[in-house]
Amino acid sequence: MERNSSLWKNLIDEHPVCTTWKQEAEGAIYHLASILFVVGFMGGSGFFGLLYVFSLLGLGFLCSAVWAWVDVCAADIFSWNFVLFVICFMQFVHIAYQVRSITFAREFQVLYSSLFQPLGISLPVFRTIALSSEVVTLEKEHCYAMQGKTSIDKLSLLVSGRIRVTVDGEFLHYIFPLQFLDSPEWDSLRPTEEGIFQVTLTAETDCRYVSWRRKKLYLLFAQHRYISRLFSVLIGSDIADKLYALNDRVYIGKRYHYDIRLPNFYQMSTPEIRRSPLTQHFQNSRRYCDK
């Protein structure tokens, strides 16, 4: 205790007070280093934010080392700043290698830049998602799924082309790029349940889509809860878009247009009108989403 008090006394009480200050300013290298430190500490998070921070801090420490060697002639100041410069340089190279090593096929690049990057998904997280999937080509007029025959065993996201959805030969709606092919079917089943498609999905043009196997995707969800919540939001939004697309085509009479926001009103006000297969399928789709 006495030793600490004596140290504090030597540093504060008995330390000589600066009576004369240097009149001339330090060299330009010193001020450049200070500016680089200020700007460097304004960097953000993520890979590119770290690259920004370590690059500017490294340059700042390098300028400080040069200033200590040329102007101050202090070996200890030079040594510390040079060591810190080397550490920042090594961190920069390590992070740059990580970013450079994350490369994707063209379909995944489109998917990331158009859908996942605007949501703030980092490249490492997207890489985890992409490694669990595969890119599949579907030729024109070939079927992705057939009504009453194809089992629901995967989840797919269209990257290019256009898919036509029909039920009993009657057109329902189109599926465009960056939309899921089978989000209602996926959402209608629990992880332990099995099911088959109630619609037919046919490629109107040559299509490319990214597909995740059902069991593999559920395993990914169990390992990464963040990815599970992300897909839950994406699938829910996709189902809502499909329901509103159906709403534009469903009529329950010559003068009545079925609105998904007022289903009970139409059931009470027009009970005598016979529903078409399209209307019935629309209501079944709503039941899937209500589960």
UniProtKB/Swiss-Prot annotation:
GO terms for molecular function: cAMP binding. Glycans are attached at N4. SUPFAM superfamilies: cAMP-binding domain-like. One of its GO terms (cellular component) is sarcolemma. It is found in: Membrane. It holds the Pfam family POPDC1-3. GO terms for biological process: heart development; regulation of membrane potential; skeletal muscle tissue development; striated muscle cell differentiation. Expressed predominantly in skeletal muscle (at protein level). Also detected in heart. The chain crosses the membrane at residues 27-44, 48-70, 77-99. The keyword RNA-binding does not apply. Its main location: membrane. Keywords: cAMP, cAMP-binding, Glycoprotein, Limb-girdle muscular dystrophy, Membrane, Nucleotide-binding, Transmembrane, Transmembrane helix. The keyword Chloroplast does not apply. It is a multi-pass membrane protein. It is linked to Muscular dystrophy, limb-girdle, autosomal recessive 26: An autosomal recessive muscular disorder characterized by adult onset of weakness and atrophy of proximal limb muscles, elevated serum creatine kinase levels, and dystrophic findings on muscle biopsy. There is no cardiac or respiratory involvement. Belongs to the popeye family. May play a role in the maintenance of heart function mediated, at least in part, through cAMP-binding. May play a role in the regulation of KCNK2/TREK-1-mediated current amplitude. This is Popeye domain-containing protein 3. It comes from Homo sapiens.
